[in-house]
Amino acid sequence: MDALVEDDICILNHEKAHRRDPVTPVSIYSGDESVASHFALVTAYEDIKKRLKDSEKENSFLKKRIRILEEKLIGARKDEETSSVGREQVNKAYHAYREVCIDRDNLKSKLDKMNKDNSESLKVLNEQLQSKEVELLQLRTEVETQQVIRNLNPPSSNWEVEKLSCDLKIHGLEQELELLRKECRDLRIELQKAKQTDPSLDDNLNCRDLQRLSVSSDNMQSAYWELKREMSNLHLVTQVQAELLRKLKTPAAIKKACAPAGCMEDLGKDSTKLHLSNFTAAYKRHAPLSPNGKTLCHATPSPLPGDAKVLSEKAALQSWTDHERSIPHDGTNFQEHNSYSRNSLEDNSWVFPSPPKSSETTFGEMKSKPLPLPNLPPLHYLDQHNQNCHYKH
């Protein structure tokens, strides 16, 4: 292509050179043939000139296209050189994307499994919560019913607290009794050792033993009388309360039989007289009598709760000031009340034992110079009494 372009340029240059040469005039009179040949040459020259211009334009266009193609070829070569590195990067990116997709699928499956487990556990917990709520409602209803029952039947005194205090006293006395037994066993062991080592110290040990036993017996006897007094007082208080409750629970038909004022007076006259002393208590019930000496109003109506409470308080206040007795510290026998040896209150009957005697048991064997001992309560007797009290409670 360059050679052709150069030829064209040479032709043009040659044409220019010919133009510069002086034109020799042609004679007009040479003939028709010379004119025709000259015209043919001119037309041929113009045609060749036109073709040369077209070829120059085409050559310039082709040169531009060649340059564009060369640039594209150079770019393609550069792309081919960098394509190996790009492919490796693309492969790495693809593998990474694939791994990320696999991890995403695994995490999605784990999430679905966890959601399923959570839904099942939530369902189980909801069932347990519903069951607990049902149990709580049942307990609330039971507590409310118990509160309603307690409000309808309020206690007239604090006999439950007194009973609990008596139980605590009994437990303390049992512990003291165990300590005294242990002390007695230790004293017996010491006495035997002293007898084996030195017979002359027998009298002194006997005297000391008797003194200790006398002190311990006095303590046990005083504790016994104190416990008996508390138990008798508690027994009579419960008996009075039971009597008042029986009067309160009489049917409504019997309530209409007597006038309210008369029945209240009869209830005041028929109230329990509670006699409390230091160690014993007596319970006496006096039925109201008519002027002819006959009892009136056999069917006692049930008073109101407030009236019953007032009457019980009056009976309790009157009972604390009557029939006091002295404390038998010397260990002599005392006269038991008839209410202790018989059953009362159907299921709540209490039986108190008779006081211990000196002839029942002794604390130790005396071989030489026996001294007179005071009346001591036997240990097994007190244990049996405590067990009976616990069983009856």
UniProtKB/Swiss-Prot annotation:
Magnesium in keyword set: no
Region Interaction with TBK1 and IKBKE, annotated ranges: 217-258
Region annotation Disordered: where it falls in the sequence: 321-340, 345-393
Annotated stretches, region: Homodimerization: 1-198
Record key words, sorted: Coiled coil, Cytoplasm, Phosphoprotein, Ubl conjugation
UniProt subunit comment: Homodimer. Interacts with IKBKE, TBK1 and TICAM1. Interacts with TAX1BP1. Interacts with CALCOCO2.
Role: Adapter protein which binds TBK1 and IKBKE playing a role in antiviral innate immunity. Activates serine/threonine-protein kinase TBK1 and facilitates its oligomerization. Enhances the phosphorylation of NF-kappa-B p65 subunit RELA by TBK1. Promotes TBK1-induced as well as TNF-alpha or PMA-induced activation of NF-kappa-B. Participates in IFNB promoter activation via TICAM1.
Name of protein: 5-azacytidine-induced protein 2
Organism lineage: Eukaryota, Metazoa, Chordata, Craniata, Vertebrata
